[in-house]
Amino acid sequence: MGNLISFMKEVANGLRESGNYGTAHIYRSSMSAVISFHGSDKLPFRKVTQEFLKSFESYLRGRNCSWNTVSTYMRTLRAVYNRAVDRHIAPYVPH
């Protein structure tokens, strides 16, 4: 099973290399927030649960992040996770 942070770095680097600098910056900012919340740059995909996501959202709101920032970071996490599922790196978890 893969590591969310490593995969986010890989995706952000690919975006930067293809000239999508703004999107790459958002991915890196989101990644930094996840690392700050989790306390480590090692986060297995299996630990990215509904409870983890709710706690992360609460953490961001507790840091006085705007709703737009919270929404952007959560969307970014969803996009990265879905990309990992497509590549069979992360498990598909139906809701």
Regions of interest found by a model, annotated:
Residues 47-50, 83-95:
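Short, charged hinge/linker segments at domain and secondary-structure junctions
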Residues 66:
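Hydrophobic, aromatic-lined core segments that form the binding pocket/scaffold
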Residues 74:
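DNA major-groove recognition helix of helix-turn-helix
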